[in-house]
Amino acid sequence: MLFDKFDDLDNRIEHLEGKLSDPEIVNDQKEFQKVVREHAHLSKLNTVYKEYKTACQDVEDNKAILHDDGEDPDLKELAKAELEELNVRIVELDKAIKIILLPKDPNDEKNTFLEIRAGAGGDEAALFVADLFRMYTRFAETMGWKVEVMSSNPLGIGGFKEIIALISGEQVFSKLKYESGVHRVQRVPETETQGRIHTSAVTVAILPEAEEVELHIDMNELKFDVFRSSGPGGQSVNTTDSAVRITHLPTGLVVICQDEKSQHKNKVKALTVLRARLLDKLESEHNAKISEARRSQVGTGDRSERIRTYNFPQGRVTDHRINLTLYKLETIMGGSLDEVIYPLITHDQAEKLKDLE
């Protein structure tokens, strides 16, 4: 693998460090955070790349010792052993660099909405909603994240029909995005006198916090028509072409303003109305996409559509996507979710690396 293009990383990192001390950048939080992220990303890449280059040079040095007939036999043995270790390390570093270079999910840095809803299973499902929310809250605490409940529908039994929270902090979406889907619980309800195991299901949706929709109107996409204002019954109330009709060609939205006697004022009003209508249309489409994302994430809440099973009698947690089984249910429910999340991240990275090959 050729990494020649990384030789200029030191200069780029130095340039970014200069930006981080620029008052203009510091006062622009959005730009400042962007520079901070790039600096952290390139610094990590640079550290691994330098170790990779050093290992490659060490390989060449050890090969030279092995091919030198005049070298001490003991030194050659050491060089041979070190060469084997170096070759393994180079493969590891090569993979590490590729992982760092994998395309980033643009949502990874965003704060995240956690939505948990009771599916099949009645009261048991509602109780498990509360259990999962506690699990995610405790995990968030260990990560230094902030959890803010946005809405909830509590039931008298101590569970929830649904609960929605905003989780804020570093890399929230990158860690929690693998939690979307149906979570199945198998346990004996407290009200069960026969000791039978009941199976219930809960849906979890993980949605990145949407940034405010910014609207830019291209004036070349607008058609302006002017005409005389008309009053009740259609009679003309103005002798000049002061009324304005604006058509937004891409969407077909039409706005007419004729309240003012001035064509300029009617045009300004019409543009204001058009902007509001376009913004509403964009936000409606955006919300429709969010709804579709939620539906595709969580399925129907049927017990058979599970991504993970929590079996209380066995103390077992199984993630069906990667065939991971851990007999640490109590620990995981207590917030040690990293034991499940990090194997999922590793699996995801491996799949993406396969796609690059």
UniProtKB/Swiss-Prot annotation:
N5-methylglutamine occurs at 235
Q: NCBIfam families under this entry?
A: prfA, PRK00591.1
Keyword Oxidoreductase applies? no
Q: How is it modified after translation?
A: Methylated by PrmC. Methylation increases the termination efficiency of RF1.
Keyword list (alphabetical) reads:
Cytoplasm, Methylation, Protein biosynthesis
Source organism of the structure = Desulfotalea psychrophila (strain LSv54 / DSM 12343)
So which domain of life are we looking at?
Answer: Bacteria
GO CC annotation, single: cytoplasm
**What GO MF annotations does this protein's record show?**
translation release factor activity, codon specific
General function of this protein? Peptide chain release factor 1 directs the termination of translation in response to the peptide chain termination codons UAG and UAA.
Know the name of this protein? Peptide chain release factor 1
Q: Which PROSITE patterns match?
A: RF_PROK_I
The record ties this protein, via Pfam families, to:
PCRF (PF03462), RF-1 (PF00472)
The record's similarity note reads: Belongs to the prokaryotic/mitochondrial release factor family.
Q: What is its main location?
A: cytoplasm
Does rRNA-binding show up as a keyword for this record?
no
Where in or outside the cell it occurs: the entry states: Cytoplasm
